[in-house]
């Protein structure tokens, strides 16, 4: 059916209005500020929705529009109607995205990351698995080291054992692997049984988001007590409006 002249006029007016709105949002030629904006750590500079100027990509939970685009490298898309009261748009994860969110940052499927220098994690199927990088063994007092203690070493991630003498005077580092005869427990000979002894895993260190749980166990090649740690997730932290979610597990 052919439209009437009145219908044609209405359609033409609508096109003119849309063109005017886009012209206001996307000026021609491009007029961009110099120097470009400085983005927070981990936030990339991207072209705006007009393909004109470089802007800081919007992060998870932040408002977005045609000009202020979401960080596509983190699997974020601009979802209309996701703002307060169903108004506006927010940067959210795509429904089919299998990335992981840790401490307010997103990681892709298969990507490895370290939320702390003592832990290495891998993103898998929307979750993550982690392994500790520091030994958590327990040094028992011995004849040649009656007061072993673990200390933080400047410039190193993992604490180290030292043998304190005289209230901290004359401390000497203990070797990473004990010698054949030094008072330290060596690994068990083959065939010697080691009765398993472990405490229950303690509560998660955080009420929401990524945390740490600990226990004491002798399940190691030395058959001696050590403090073991593993990551825990009590429940996801609720996203904060206008800001990237934060986590204080580390």
Curated annotation (Swiss-Prot):
Stretches assigned to the IGFBP N-terminal domain: 24-103
Q: Tell me which UniProt keywords the record has, alphabetically.
A: Cell adhesion, Disulfide bond, Secreted, Signal
Q: Which gene encodes it?
A: CCN5
Q: List the disulfide bonds.
A: 26-50, 30-52, 32-53, 39-56, 64-78, 70-100
Q: Which PANTHER family match?
A: CCN FAMILY MEMBER 5, CONNECTIVE TISSUE GROWTH FACTOR-RELATED
Any GO BP annotation: signal transduction
Q: Which GO terms describe its molecular function?
A: heparin binding; integrin binding
Entry annotated with the keyword Signal: yes
For this chain, the family text in UniProt reads: Belongs to the CCN family.
Give the InterPro entries listed for this entry: CCN, Growth_fac_rcpt_cys_sf, IGFBP-like, Insulin_GF-bd_Cys-rich_CS, TSP1_CCN, TSP1_rpt, TSP1_rpt_sf, VWF_dom
| Stretches assigned to coiled coil | none
Its tissue distribution reads: Expressed in primary osteoblasts, fibroblasts, ovary, testes, and heart.
Where primarily located?
Answer: secreted
Cellular component annotations (GO), alphabetically ordered:
extracellular matrix; extracellular space; nucleus
Identify the residues that the record assigns to the VWFC domain, covering every copy: 98-164
Q: Where is the signal peptide?
A: 1-23
* Known role: May play an important role in modulating bone turnover. Promotes the adhesion of osteoblast cells and inhibits the binding of fibrinogen to integrin receptors. In addition, inhibits osteocalcin production.
Q: Which SUPFAM superfamilies does the record cross-reference, listed alphabetically? A: Growth factor receptor domain, TSP-1 type 1 repeat
- Where would you find this protein in the cell? Secreted
Q: Which residues form the TSP type-1 domain?
A: 194-238
Gene3D superfamilies per the record?
Thrombospondin type-1 (TSP1) repeat (2.20.100.10)
Which protein, by its recorded name, is this?
Answer: CCN family member 5
């Amino acid at each position: 059916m052919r439209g009437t002249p009145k219908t044609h006029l209405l359609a033409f007016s609508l096109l003119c209005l849309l063109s005017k709105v886009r012209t206001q949002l996307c000026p021609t030629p491009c007029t961009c500020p110099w120097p470009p904006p400085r983005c927070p750590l981990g936030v990339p500079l991207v072209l705006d929705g007009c393909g004109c100027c470089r802007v800081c990509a919007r992060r998870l939970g932040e408002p977005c529009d045609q000009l202020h685009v979401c960080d596509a490298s983190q699997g974020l898309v601009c979802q209309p109607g996701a703002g307060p009261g169903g108004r506006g748009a927010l940067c959210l994860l795509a429904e089919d995205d299998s990335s992981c969110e840790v401490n307010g940052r997103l990681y892709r499927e298969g990507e490895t990351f370290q939320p702390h220098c003592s832990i290495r994690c891998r993103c898998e199927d929307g979750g993550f698995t982690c392994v500790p990088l520091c030994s958590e063994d327990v040094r028992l007092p011995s004849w040649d080291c009656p007061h072993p203690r673990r200390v933080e070493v400047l410039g190193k991630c993992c604490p180290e054992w030292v043998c304190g003498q005289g209230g901290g005077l004359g401390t000497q580092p203990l070797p990473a692997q004990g010698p054949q005869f030094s008072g330290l427990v060596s690994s068990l000979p083959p065939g010697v049984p080691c009765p398993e002894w472990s405490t229950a895993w303690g509560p998660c260190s955080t009420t929401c988001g990524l945390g740490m749980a600990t226990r004491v166990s002798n399940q190691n090649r030395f058959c001696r007590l050590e403090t073991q740690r593993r990551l825990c997730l009590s429940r996801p932290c609720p996203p904060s409006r206008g800001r990237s979610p934060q986590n204080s597990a580390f």
